A protein has these predicted regions:
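Alpha/beta enzyme core
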Residues: 2-248, 282-293
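Flexible C-terminal active-site loop/helix
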Residues: 250-293
């Protein structure tokens, strides 16, 4: 796989002059759908990974290898430039370096490393705490050192705006910019004053973990230096509901022929690359793929 090309495409997005919404993806099929629909960037979140791979909530119980394996499955399925949420880097600065190595090998175009104290330690359940700026800087340095392909984008992430306020947020993102991260990712920015403080503080692209309506439309976000703005992870949630409703209908006695919300055959053939597989069968096995229901 030629991962560098999609990383360069991701860089062209964040070095451009407009903000985009990434398509939230969770497996090979969803990634192909996002690519087919024209999303410039895909997003694979840690919370969605935990739900998809383990059926567990976002409590940092997913391992690095489990996350990297699923990221690789997504990357190899198509040509979508994938941004992944690498949480806290699965440990200290040494673990962060290893995390970058594994995710780069998996083919991701960009990743975020955050300065939240994770996983939650004994006696701190119910609250969110941040590591020190000094430890955060160490993690960012380790992430950058672990990168082999210079086109891989590394973003320093913080939730400080929602925890310790604007002043600490600025101190953190300026410190991360100073050591060389390519972008900063912020959660908890809810109004234009907060966004202006952030925008004035750094000269690198800004990613937002969701934008409140008070922040304005894509044009307003673009003008403030935001280049990636998440919209949530509705595709996986919708898939869960659709699966639940379909199974319930079948369990309740609805004949399969009356289930009308399934993907049509031509869509499934397209998304599973059936034509490619038919050609390979002809070229290499001397036969054709039989039609199946």
């Amino acid at each position: 796989m030629h991962w560098s090309e999609r990383r360069e495409r991701f860089r062209s997005v964040i070095e451009g002059d407009r903000c985009v919404h990434p398509g939230s993806v969770f497996d090979p099929i969803s990634a192909r759908i996002a690519e087919e629909l024209g999303f410039e960037v895909g997003m694979f979140a840690g919370s969605v990974a935990s739900q998809t791979v383990l059926g567990a909530p976002d409590l940092i119980v997913l391992s690095l290898s489990e996350f990297a394996d699923q990221a690789y499955r997504i990357c190899r399925a198509g040509n979508l430039a994938l941004l992944v949420d690498a949480d806290h880097g699965y440990g200290n600065a040494l673990n962060v370096r290893r995390t970058v190595e594994e995710l780069e090998t998996a083919g991701v175009a960009a990743l975020t490393i955050e300065d939240t104290e994770l996983p939650q330690s004994y006696g701190t359940v119910g609250g969110t705490r941040l590591i020190s700026i000094e430890e955060g800087v160490g993690k960012m340095k380790a992430a950058l050192d672990g990168r082999q392909d210079p086109s891989l984008v590394i973003a320093g992430r913080t939730s400080a705006m929602d925890i310790t306020g604007p002043e600490d947020t600025v101190a953190r993102i300026k410190a991360y910019e100073a050591v060389g991260v390519d972008a900063v990712f912020l959660s908890g920015v809810t109004n234009t004053d907060q966004l202006a403080v952030v925008s004035d503080a750094v000269n690198i692209p800004i990613f937002l973990g969701g934008a409140a309506s008070a922040l304005g439309d894509l044009d307003a976000l673009s003008a403030a230096g935001v280049r990636i703005c998440l919209q949530g992870h509705q595709p996986f949630q919708a898939a869960v509901k659709a699966t639940y409703n379909t199974l319930k209908a079948l369990r309740d006695g609805t004949p399969p022929s009356e289930i009308t919300t399934t993907a049509p055959k031509d869509m499934m053939k397209r998304l599973t690359r059936e034509d490619d597989h038919r050609k390979w069968m002809q070229d290499w096995l001397g036969g054709e793929l039989a039609e199946r229901d």
